[in-house]
Amino acid sequence: MKASEIREKDIVELNKELGELKSELFKLRFQLATNQLENPMKLKDVKKSIARVKTIIREKELSGNNK
């Protein structure tokens, strides 16, 4: 997911997206531990997406813009 796509969402949607990404990361880590993960790069992608969402949430909080 690109940062420009994330910026279009409001804080409520971003928090929902963050929860979904965290649960996906949990599932991927579980698959990695049980040697069922086919694509290890997926972990990196999900972690970066979580960081992007958190960064944009913080930007919106600091700017006072809840859109």
UniProtKB/Swiss-Prot annotation:
Q: Does the keyword Ion transport apply?
A: no
CDD domains in the record, alphabetically?
Ribosomal_L29_HIP
Q: Name one GO molecular function term.
A: structural constituent of ribosome
Keyword match Transferase: no
Q: Which UniProt keywords apply?
A: Ribonucleoprotein, Ribosomal protein
Q: Which GO terms describe its biological process?
A: translation
Q: Which InterPro entries match?
A: Ribosomal_protein_uL29, Ribosomal_uL29, Ribosomal_uL29_CS, Ribosomal_uL29_sf
Instruction: Output the Gene Ontology cellular-component terms.
Output: cytosolic large ribosomal subunit
By sequence similarity, the record places it as follows:
Belongs to the universal ribosomal protein uL29 family.
Record's protein name: Large ribosomal subunit protein uL29
Q: Which organism is it from?
A: Ruminiclostridium cellulolyticum (strain ATCC 35319 / DSM 5812 / JCM 6584 / H10)
